[in-house]
């Protein structure tokens, strides 16, 4: 079972004539992950992350800012009992999560992971935030 689903709410996302998405390398994974988790627009999420970044004196996509944002929005930081890939985590977790990988964030929601490509499914997670 493939538990990946394409997701890119960025207003500048482009598609080929056949409807398939073009490659995406914008560095906005933090914004996209939280967009999906909170059912918000890319712009609203980016503005909120920037506001938190002003408080933390850090950039919107940096770990200190994303952690402060997640906690401010009611998420709870959790530890993994063992090493898990994003795909394995998604298969066993129903609910809403923002997963922290090495230099990447991805949203897992109701047993699927949402990103601009399925390449991160085999990556190991470091920690995650759960929306409670």
Regions found by a protein language model. Name each.
Residues 53-103, 109-111, 115-118:
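Conserved active-site-adjacent core of cysteine acyl-enzyme catalytic domains
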